[in-house]
A protein has these predicted regions:
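Eukaryote-biased RCC1-like beta-propeller repeat architecture
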Residues: 1-150
């Protein structure tokens, strides 16, 4: 689980054995029974968080997106299927000011302030992009209809 404090800090807690989904580093083989601040985000003001099955997303006050946890289906958006044990910026969204994020079990979605939506992760008809393979980096949805929020 993830929470954002009034100061914009992110805390996580819960089972910690799945590929760094809590964001505290590689050696998370025990449960985190109480909220613990994610040190890798120190100094970053966070506006929103989203938790998938074994991955997490963070949205900063400046519209940047970070991800961490299991990347087996590309749901982290880093161009690979590796685990990420601490938060890492989604480089494919650099320069895009994101206003909203959500995480599915094996997918991630973001909406930019201009209404353009992006999706990445397990394709298996979960993203609605008409693809047959997992999407390892954010892919822009067609812009015939702009989005407000995910």
């Amino acid at each position: 689980s993830l929470v954002v404090s009034s100061a914009g800090d992110v805390y996580s807690f819960g089972p910690g054995s799945n590929c760094g989904k809590l964001g505290h580093g590689e050696f998370e083989d025990t449960n985190q029974l109480t909220p613990k601040v994610i040190e890798a985000l120190a100094g970053v003001k966070v506006r929103a968080v989203a938790a998938g099955l074994f991955h997490s997303l963070v949205l900063t006050e400046h519209g940047a997106v970070y991800s961490f946890g299991q990347g087996e289906f590309g749901q982290l958006g880093h161009g690979d299927e590796e685990c990420q044990y601490t938060p890492k910026a989604v480089e494919a969204l650099r320069g895009v000011k994101v206003s909203s994020i959500t995480a599915g079990s094996r997918t991630s979605l973001a909406v930019a302030v201009n209404g353009v939506a992006y999706g990445w992760g397990c394709e298996d008809a979960r993203l609605g992009l008409g693809l047959t393979e997992d999407q390892l980096t954010p892919l822009q949805y067609p812009t015939e209809q702009l989005c407000v929020k995910v």
